[in-house]
């Protein structure tokens, strides 16, 4: 039995609150257990200079964490005057993952700004951000469709992410919380599409190694978890799903 009573292959409770904010074109509050992230999507009617004239859009992301999202207060990065390497890595990961499933040509010369703000952290903040950001982005695209600025919702597939790991005395477990993540022998983040294609796999042994058999078991667990997350995304999107499938 895991520390929170879940089975080894069981996700934490997932809830996606849509249209959580008033102003953005798309927004959600995603709850993955005690991890909570506000994700918003903003449409800008222009692209970065390096993309001008190509007839394609762009998706980029920013990620941050409020000071008391964690057990001990952390200083705001804006107070330090620079973004940490961890934050930069996560921002790039989110943007890169979303671009993998966006039809950039169908989007046209527009930029989608994704903002992910962690308001409570209990492990898996980057994977929750990706799963929530996808829904916020599709909500924003639906606004473009309603305004007849695009001919279809410009996504090629669903996108979700989760964590898996090898935890002492438990073996392979799905969707690690902070207590599990902090003592995991192997920690892995997996991003996949709704059709089961891999977008990114980040796996690391923490003073440990893992076998090919364990790698396969980790990926199998992640795949099943991601398919469940995609179903949660579909529930949150409601009728919009008909424009994707």
Swiss-Prot record:
PROSITE patterns: RIBONUCLEASE_PH
Catalytic activity as recorded in UniProt: tRNA(n+1) + phosphate = tRNA(n) + a ribonucleoside 5'-diphosphate
InterPro entries registered for this protein in UniProt: ExoRNase_PH_dom1 (IPR001247), ExoRNase_PH_dom2 (IPR015847), ExoRNase_PH_dom2_sf (IPR036345), PNPase/RNase_PH_dom_sf (IPR027408), Ribosomal_Su5_D2-typ_SF (IPR020568), RNase_PH (IPR050080), RNase_PH_bac-type (IPR002381), RNase_PH_CS (IPR018336)
Gene Ontology molecular functions: 3'-5'-RNA exonuclease activity; tRNA binding; tRNA nucleotidyltransferase activity
UniProt: phosphate binding residues: 86, 124-126
Keywords: Nucleotidyltransferase, RNA-binding, rRNA processing, Transferase, tRNA processing, tRNA-binding
EC category name: transferase
GO biological process entries: rRNA catabolic process; rRNA processing; tRNA processing
Coiled-coil boundaries: none
Pfam families tied to this protein: RNase_PH, RNase_PH_C
Keyword Protease listed: no
This enzyme's EC code(s): 2.7.7.56
Similarity comment text for this entry: Belongs to the RNase PH family.
NCBIfam families the UniProt entry points to: RNasePH
Function: Phosphorolytic 3'-5' exoribonuclease that plays an important role in tRNA 3'-end maturation. Removes nucleotide residues following the 3'-CCA terminus of tRNAs; can also add nucleotides to the ends of RNA molecules by using nucleoside diphosphates as substrates, but this may not be physiologically important. Probably plays a role in initiation of 16S rRNA degradation (leading to ribosome degradation) during starvation.
Subunit structure: Homohexameric ring arranged as a trimer of dimers.
Record protein name field: Ribonuclease PH
Protein source organism: Bacillus mycoides (strain KBAB4) (Bacillus weihenstephanensis)
């Amino acid at each position: 039995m895991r520390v929170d009573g879940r089975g080894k292959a069981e996700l934490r409770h997932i809830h996606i609150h849509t249209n959580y904010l008033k102003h953005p074109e798309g927004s959600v509050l995603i709850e993955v257990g005690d991890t909570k992230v506000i994700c918003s999507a903003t449409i800008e009617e222009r692209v970065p200079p390096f993309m001008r004239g190509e007839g394609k859009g762009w998706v980029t992301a920013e990620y941050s964490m409020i000071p008391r999202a964690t057990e001990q207060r952390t200083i705001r990065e804006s107070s330090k005057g620079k973004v940490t390497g961890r934050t930069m890595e996560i921002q790039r990961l989110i943007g890169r993952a979303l671009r993998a499933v966006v039809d950039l040509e169908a989007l046209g010369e527009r930029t989608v700004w994704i903002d992910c703000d962690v308001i409570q952290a209990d492990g898996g903040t980057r994977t929750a951000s990706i799963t929530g950001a996808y829904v916020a982005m599709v909500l924003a695209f639906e606004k473009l469709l309603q305004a007849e600025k695009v001919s279809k919702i410009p996504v090629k597939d669903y996108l979700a992410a989760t964590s898996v790991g090898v935890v002492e005395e438990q073996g392979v477990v799905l969707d690690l919380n902070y207590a599990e993540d902090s003592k995991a022998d192997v920690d892995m983040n997996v991003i996949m599409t709704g059709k089961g294609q891999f977008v990114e796999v980040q796996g690391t042994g923490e003073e440990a190694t893992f076998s090919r058999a364990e790698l396969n078991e980790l990926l199998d667990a992640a795949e099943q978890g991601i398919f469940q997350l995609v179903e949660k995304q579909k529930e949150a999107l409601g009728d919009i799903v008909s424009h994707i499938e």
